[in-house]
Amino acid sequence: MGVMLQAFYWDCPRAENCEHHWWGLIKSRLPLIAQAGFTALWLPPVNKAAGWKSMGYDPYDYYDLGEFDQKGGVPTWFGSKADLVDLIESAHAAGLQVYADLVFNHNSGGDAQELNPIDGRSRWTRFEPKSAKFPRDWKCFHPSRYETWDGATFGDMPDLCHRAPLVYTELISYARWLLEEIGFDGFRYDMVKGYGGWMVRSIQELRALRDGTTFKPYAVGECWDSERTIGDWLDEANAWSDNPVGAFDFPLRWRLRDLCDSYGFRLRDLAERGVLMWDRPAQAVTFVENHDVVRDSPIINDKLLAYAFILTHEGYPCVFWQDYFNWNLAQPDNQSGIDALIKVHEQNAAGPMQVLFVDNDLYVMQRLGAGDQNGLALVLNNRGSWNGTWVQTRWNNTRLVPAAWAGRDDLNMPHEKWTNESGWADLWAPPRGYGVYIPA
């Protein structure tokens, strides 16, 4: 399915000394990104926000992508509209799709207060953007005559009423504009618990037209909750849809944090249901860090264990920018980093998953392969010394070659193995590490 790169982190323009030039920085890294095997970029919100130096999750003018002088300046914190379009075109030329982050739950930075006659309260709900597109007043927000409340608010920011005909039609028109005019290929929906899944479904059923060709947008939703709640949201958003949306696998992320940081974590817990990857693999977007969890609950130790897991199992894996570029986990010149795992994912990680062995300290899984991808075997080792076991793989009389590996204080390459006539082989991994074997 490919590998997504989250191409930002919180306050990245300030941290990288490229305020209002983040799009240009991403463009400069495109050769490395494409060479590594990434297939898509997830960008931060591109709209003009309430604050000039804002990550965009407080949207003010959806159609101002860095073109109008308002809220402190012309460009967004990430750059100008021209820079954004140039980045998208360059990404397409490099073979990458680009996903926009849609913040459709709330707005911020209103130009004037208004009295809402339904509850008699004044709010900043008058929006007069310089783009002159999608101006809003109190009738666009909760409470309205169409709906008093729809899920969850975000702080004290005005909460959009998607049942209001103007809001519904404008948001769909905006999504189509991003696809057809700006060049995006899909969306990440922010805070989907704040509004009805039917709104997402309406957008996903769009057939965008670009360069004479129609296409369906990809999409993933941020439903930060339990597996059951995420599943309920997916059922609602995808009911009768011919273009289903996926969801970030937050329950799996918490397991991966415990795998990396909790002493005594039982590897057998990785094989338990209750995460999207096992229960709804076609809709699971797996991840290790993102711009939110890394600030409040980061993974501190042995993070490559988590990346080895998501880049060998089913789901659509998403790699975090800081892990790849800032914290030296790419390791492009050896087999002990994210780059080697991406290569394995793109060349071998296909077909159903099958756990061959699991106990508290050892986990062995194989992918059965599909088409021209021949599958793989993953060994995770929780011990402080080399560890392995005999397992029966799908390959008979086949040489299994280590393609990616890493261990704590031990980067020695696992030995090549041969399966016998019944597919049995003795597969090992380094101390507190992993080994990925592929058929030669």
Model-derived segments and spans:
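Glycan-binding loop/region signatures in secreted carbohydrate-active enzymes
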Residues: Q6, G109-E170, E236-Y263, N328-N348
